[in-house]
Amino acid sequence: MRAAAIFGLGCSPRHLKAFQVATGCRELGWRIGMPAAGDGTDAILLFGGDGTIHRHLGQLVKLGLPVLIVPAGSGNDFARALGFRSVRDSIAAWQRFCADQSHVAAIDLGVISPLANAGGAPAPHEPAGHTVLAAQHYFCSVAGIGLDAEVSRLANALPRWLLGHGGYALTLVPTIFRFAPFPMKISSADEIGGSTLNNQPTLLAAFANTSTYGGGMKIAPQAKFDDGQLDVCVIGAINPFKLACLFPTIYFGRHLTIRGVNYFKSPRVRVETETPLDVYADGEFVCRTPVEVGVQRAALKVLLP
């Protein structure tokens, strides 16, 4: 059996020692870094947080190998969604996999597709009204536009130790009082090119494959990574003071009944804004609006606890 190990920021091969000792298998070969297709690798261990996972998703999907997530980042929302709350949980899952290759599941991933020439003049070789999908970007947890994207941008500039100790929440509070609502049009899969689901002043829109982001904020409490659906949460132009009171409820998923919060499920949505806005996913910048956001079923093989 052969395994590869990928390390995110702040991690190194020394973190692999516990997994080598836990298996006690001398016949297990290791390599550091992303394996090549067909090189005999049986599984990949990924040490890091949501951002590290996000940056490798494209290659992981292509390889199609089982991936073990080892929570070693600042937020670890995706690891928690899979059931890994500590490195010890990952070690136990690795021991089971080495014994009988069990507890492997294929889960959904979110997909962001930037729209080229949406709403603008077509390129010379395109018919009027034609929409071009640029390169697709995978995400594992949640994509966001608006207030949460701005908070992610600011949080990424914080020292790593602070980001892992409430930095997202600390950045959020002042941003609430200076962020202006923006017009946004969201169309679901059945209404793309037709009916508008939302065209009101908006503070944020989150598109969730799993339930949490920002280190535990349960923005989409009903989200599941194996149902083929995005959970979409849209927060309208709420008074900043009311919004400041609202955000603590998100940690418990109790915000869905509050007036101004819209929540629905769809396999695919189109998002358009009057001016291009940043799109962040898993805490990382992806592109700018307009975009289509959807789900790719059973895109990633992962080890589960």
Q: Model-found features: residue ranges?
A:
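Short Gly/Thr/Asp-enriched flexible loops that form oxyanion-binding sites at enzyme active sites
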Residues: T52-L63
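Glycine-rich phosphate/pyrophosphate-binding beta-alpha loops
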Residues: G144, D148, L204-A220, F285
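Short Gly/aromatic-enriched secondary-structure transition segments
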Residues: A155, A220-A223
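Catalytic core of DAGKc-family lipid kinases
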Residues: A3-A5, L9-F19, K62-P66, A72-L203
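Short acidic low-complexity segments
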Residues: W30-G40
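ATP/nucleoside-binding phosphotransfer catalytic cores, i.e., glycine-rich phosphate-binding loops
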Residues: S188-G194, N199, K224-F225, L230, ...
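Glycine-rich beta-strand-to-loop/alpha-helix junction loops that act as flexible
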Residues: F47-G49, V70-G73
